[in-house]
Amino acid sequence: MTERLTRIKDRLFQEYYEKKEWWGDNLSIFDDDPSLVEKPLPVRKALAVQKVAREMPIEIKDHELIVGVPTMSSVGFGHTFPRYETDEEAEAAAKVSLNRKSVWGHHNPYYQKILDKGLNAIVEEAKSFLDKTSDDEEKRTFYESVITALPAAEILASRYGALAEYLAGEAETEEREREFKVMAQICRKVPMEPAETFHEALQSVWTVHTILHSTLNYTSIGRVDQYLYPYYKKDIENELITEDVARDLLGSFLVKFNERVQLNNEHIENHFTFGDWSQGGDPDLETTHLKMSNDEAYTYGQSSNHWLQNCIVSGYTPEGEDGTNKISLMVIELVNELELIDPLVSVRLHKDSPEEILDVTARFLAKGGAQPTVFNDDTVVPGMVKHLGIPVEDARDYSNDGCWETLPYGRTEFGYGHIEVLLSLESLLNRGKSLLNGNEIGSDSGDPAELDTWEKFFDAYKRQVRDRLDVAIDNKLTYYDEVPKIAPVPFLSGIMEDCLAKGRDMTQRGARYRLYAPLITGFSHAIDSLAVIKKLVFEEKSLTMERLISALKNNWGGEEQLRQYVMNKVPKYGNDDDYVDSIGVEFLDDYCSYLDEYNQKVDWITFAPGVGTFENYPRLGYVCGASPDGRLAQAALASNYSPSVGMDHNGPTAAVKSSTKFDLERLNDGCPVDLRMSFKHVDNEEEGIDILKSFLRSYVRLGGNILTVTTVETETLKEAQKKPKDYESLRVRLGGLTAYFVQLAKPQQDEYIKRTEHGF
């Protein structure tokens, strides 16, 4: 690592323990000009974006070459943003659980267009459309909002340019004076004008990202290696920069994503409101979230350091060639060396991926960085083409959102909802009522004891899940058009493909693709529970339905022997056992087939199935009663598509084989398997890396979809609990994000330690 990056890293880790100040509460555009109330809401939103760019705090940090600091926010603890809506608009939105913070994020801007054209050209494009639009007031308002919003980037960049110019006069060395002057010059050019150099391209992307993340948009940066490489290549060939300078520039860029991290939970502020989760969570999510945040059992602390900032490298180009380049490798190497948790790094592999990308991936995973997340192009791309109807060129150009969900890069409006299939089983067993509080959680399918065959029981369960899907999709379709009435995204819409051509905000069906992912949640627990019922109740008849339900109602109290039996003697998903895996295959087939029916009926949005919890598995388990697989009431669920915690006993390959028995092209939004591994039985590091590379190739060959690997021994995790300062850079994967282990609450750490430690 270069001397500059070493200093930046040292500064960064010191700042982790300093309180980050929140800014922007109680601001309003009406304080500046009360007459703005007469303007259309989308234009008022754009003016609020300008206000943020004009007034937000700015600073240039020591040694850095890329400048810009987004305002403080986080997925776990909310946002701040100036008021632009009237009282009447706020009241109307609240009736459908929305507010000005109801911006979904999870999208990729089309950065290639920004770099190629610059924002000024996009503003001129919007003006041209406006001039041609005379009889559609809604379209005119949209174009006016984009024309107003995009210059916010120039406002912010100009402020940084002026600050850099001032600091040049205060610089202690000639070298730093020169760097400040270069930064000032670049900030006066990009992102409004096209980028011409590697430094300009990086600063252009970061300035836009800073504006987006300071104005409620939690966006990712997409295929960063594909759009940055031409600038790097040209500068290297023209000898404008050296390899070390390129690493300094890229490293300075990557560090910026981590600058809002806080490792001292006492510094966390809660700015969460009902609107922050209104577009994807269940109705009681805010209440549950706040309760969980203050509960000693779990904390949302890990989400306080999450901003949905993903980048993805390598994989096929739109033309079908391998896209691995020097930036692909350098991104992985630098995030590894700098020991960052942001940006989240993902890598796209396929059957012909070059050895060099596998090598840097395996070395990062072996170090224990819990990154990169591995995507299999040979499953994802055909899945998009066959089952979502996406043209192959756009499918090959897929990216991911802030966690892992796959979507065509720069062209997609995306949303998801949790379909809690374990609650569907609870509903079937308890006549539509929660085991925790008796509240209605589903339909009453009658007395489950009267379902006298496995086939009848399984069919009843699948109907329960379909009912839950119906509710989620009906809500999505019913309330979709409410969002632009309170929370349009004019800045993002201006840099999202097709919005300008259609004359529509992204939230008004402006993007080329609209994907909604109903994500199966609690998969492994549901399938393991169904295996218990099939085997013990219907086949062996050693357990009555009445006794099982009684045990669940009593949270397994008085039935510990039975609980241990179902946990240890009945086959479990994740062990390459066809008995239980076949139940999962049949269930997933029914689930995907039902969504196929919806895709035949609804033509303006596409439903993309997946399996996912993200980092929310404690909260998602908190609302579930005890389950037939032996899980206790309110215990955390397994993450994503992973085996239940501690139930995968036959090694990582067996876990992967269980997960790939279903055709994963049909789970085309994604279904990550999260594994914890250890090299303690391997003779040396190089042998371990070779084994890991072989495992990754096998994962691709077997038809896997998404894989995460955290390489850390149980003993190391326990030692980190005792001496957190010695392990401040220890990272673990939490379903949808990577977190510093020491920042998690102890119960969350303990839950992670319970995960099976697979050896090679």
Predicted feature residues:
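Mature N-terminal, pre-catalytic/accessory segment of carbohydrate-active enzymes
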Residues: 1-2, 140-166, 170, 175-189, ...
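Conserved catalytic cores of very large enzyme subunits
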Residues: 1-143, 179-181, 190-193, 197-760
